[in-house]
Amino acid sequence: MALKVMVLIVALIAWLPAEAQFLGLGLESNIELTKNDLAIIHRIVDEQVHGKAVGTTASWSNSESGNYGSIKLIKKYSVNGRPCESIGYTLATRKMSTSPEHYMLNSCQLPDGSWRIS
């Protein structure tokens, strides 16, 4: 079952509190992401982006779905002493002729180590 891009980004950053916040936004996308796409993006953000230097960029791709993209740490800042980050996401697909889609989300780290969209 394919999921809309924004749901993917939620899972990516996400953790449960962020997903609850994001689902109400109703943003549309021409690219459908699979559960495996979401898992790949989440792993890349967690392992290669969160907590790294500003400008860090990581790529991802899924040969099964034909979807791919990049993730870039745009900015680091703090809110009430909590570390926060602005992360840019570029999503694309090989399945249809469509332009890459760009998103930026801000998230802050919670005391338990998880990240929440802010």
Residue ranges and their predicted role:
Residues 1-2:
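N-terminal secretory signal peptides that target proteins for export/translocation
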Residues 5-14:
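Sec-dependent N-terminal signal peptides
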Residues 14-15, 111:
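Generic short alpha-helical hydrophobic face used as a protein-protein interaction/packing hotspot
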Residues 16-20:
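Sec/Tat signal peptide C-region and signal peptidase I cleavage site
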Residues 21-118:
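Extended interaction-bearing regions that mediate binding to partners or small molecules
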